[in-house]
Amino acid sequence: MKIKRNFIKTGMLVLIFALLSNEMISCKDNTGSFQSERENLDGTIIDDGSTTNYVDKTTAAASAVIADDLYENFVADGTVEISFNGNTWTSKVSGITASEVSIKAVENSQSDETSAGVEIQYKGSAKLKYVLSGNYTGTVFIKNKKADAAVVLNNVNLTSADGSGPVLRFSAEDTRTFIVVPAGTTNTLTDTRLLNQSSTMYDDKKGSVYAKGALIFTGETSTKAGGTLNIVNSGYKHAVYSKDYIRIANLNLNVTVEGQTGRDCIRALNAIIVDAGNLKLIGNGTITDDESAGLRVDGEDADDDDMTVEYTAGAGFIIINGGNIDITTVAKGITAHWKSANTVIGNSQYTATANKSLLCTNYLKNTSAAKPNPFVEINGGNINVVTTGQPYEGRSDSDPSCSPEGIEAKADLTINAGTITLKTTDDSINAGGNIVINGGAIYACSSINDAIDSNGKNGITINGGVVVAIGSSGAECAFDCDNAPFTINGGYVLGLGGSNYTAPSASGKQTTLVLGGSSFGSADSSLAITDSNGKAVFVYTLPNASRELMILSSPNLKTDTSYSVKTGTTVKTGSASRFHNLYITMPSVSGGSESLSGISTTSSNSVYTDSNVGRGGFGGRGARAAGGFGGGRGGNFRNRQLPEDMPEPPEGFNGKRPNKLR
C-alpha cells in the first residue's frame, strides 16, 4: 500500500535505510526493463512463458453491452466517399444531396483552432458514413454534430501537416463515431506534432485522433475480424483521446507513442471498454509526472482557465470483456485513474458541467453515484502488460509521481475471467478499493514492489481461478492488503515474496499454507505437497530466484487431512498442465527431502503457518502488524504509526527501505 506523507528528514535514518537497501531484491536490469537472458545474481525472476501450457477456459458474461455500440446496428442514411491523392481529393455523395455536405481546404488558424487540412461539414440530422481512401497530408476534420456517424478507413494513410494539428478530429458531442476498419485493409494515421511546438501548433487538441463524443474502433461486424489500423504519435499528448468513452471491438489496432515527449496511448474522460480484437500499445513518453500509460480513464476534466469541471457520475471505469491486449509502457499499463483526493468536484470555485455521455442513457441510467467510480472489471481476453519506468513519488498527491503498475483501479478491481500476464516495476495489480478474483489465470510479477495490492477495507478475496503472484523481496510481498482481510475461498494460488506479508484469513473456505524459505526449497527446485499416501496434491517449480515466503492454496488441499512438504523433488511433467510452473493437473513426482510433516488445517482455521515464518529483525519479518524492529512481528511502516520518538522515513522511501540510493 502506498501512502504519501510529509516526512521528517533525518540524516541518521537516511543512512540506516541506505545501508539496508541491499536487502531489497530487484527484478530488472539497469534500464528498468525485464531481462531477456538468464541472469539471477540480483534476484531477477525470469519467466518467458515456456513454463505454461495451461489454457484457461473460464468464461464470464460481458458487461456494458450496448446494442447501439455495434456497427452492424448502424444504418447509414447517406454516404460521403473521399479519395485522397497527396494534397488533393475527389469526393462522391450519395443518399443525401451533395449541397448538404461542405468539403473544403482550410489553413492554419489560431483564431478558430484549425490546422491545415480538409474540413468536412454536415449540419443535418441524418446518419452518414464517410469512406476515406488514399494518401493525404493534413488534418482531416469531420464536423457531424447531430447524429451518429461512421468513418470507414479503406487503405488510407493520413499524416498531419508540419506538426500543426491532430491527424483525425471529430467535433460531435453526445453522439458516437464508429471508426471502421474493414478486413483486408491496412491504414496508418501519423500525428507529427511535438511538445513545445507552439509556434506551429494551431490545433492543440489532446489526441492524434481526437473526439468530443464517443469513439468506437471496430471491424465491420462484431463477429468477424477487421483490418489493421496503425496510429503513431510523434510526441504530443495522447495518441487517442475522447471526452466521452472509447470502445474497441474486432480489428487490429496498433498504437505507438513514439517520441519521449508524448503521453498516453489511449485516454478517455468517461470510460474505456474493450470487447474483442487485437490491441498493441507502446508508450515511450518519459516526461516527469506524465510518463506514458497504455489505457487510462480520467473520470473528470477540470479546466483552470474558465474554472469548470466536467464529469459523468458513475463513470471513470475500464471494462475488458475480451480481446488480445499487449501493452508496453513507461508508466501504468491500464488505469482507472480518478482520485477523490485530487478532485475539484464540489469545489465552490468551479462550475460543474453535466457531461451528457451516452453512457448515462445506455449503461449508467440506474446509478446513484454522485461522483466518478473508477473501477476495473475484466471478464475475458488475453492481457499482457510490461512496465519499464522507475517508480518515484513526492510528499503529497499533488507532487510528481510515477507508479508503473500493470493494472490499477482507484476503486474496486474485479477479475472474472481472462489470461493475464503482468511484468511490472511497481505493483502488478493495485486497487484503491477491494480486489476480487473469481476466475481467470493471472501471473503478476513485480520487480520492485508488491504483486497484488489492495487498499480497500475488504482487502483481497480469491474465489477461483489460477493466481501466481511474485513480489519483490524485503518489505514487499505477493499479496498486500495491510490490516484488511486476505481471504482465499477457492482457486489455485501461489504467492512468493518478502516475509513482511499479509496473513491469509483463517475464515477462508479453502486450505492455505504459509511456508518460510527454509521449508520450500531453493531457486530452480521443485516443491511438492503430498498426502499420507505419498500422492502429490500440489506441485510448483520455483523460478531462478527465490523469495523469503510462500503462500499456497489449492482445491486439492482439504481440512482435517495430514500433509507433508517435500523439497528438491524430481518432476516428470508428462501430460500435466501448468501455469508459470504452478501445476494445475498433477505430474509424476519422486525423491526430494521432507521439510515438514503432519501439517493440517481445520474447518475453523483454514490456514497453516510454518514455524519458520515470522522470524527476523529490522523492517519486516512476519505477518503484517503495527510497526517495530522486533523479531517475529512485521516492522511494516506503511499506513501505520511509527514507534514513539522514531522519525518517519525520509521522503521518497514510501515508508520502507529503498531499493537503491537515487
Where are these regions (language model features)?
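Hydrophobic helical h-region of N-terminal Sec-dependent signal peptides
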Residues: 12-21
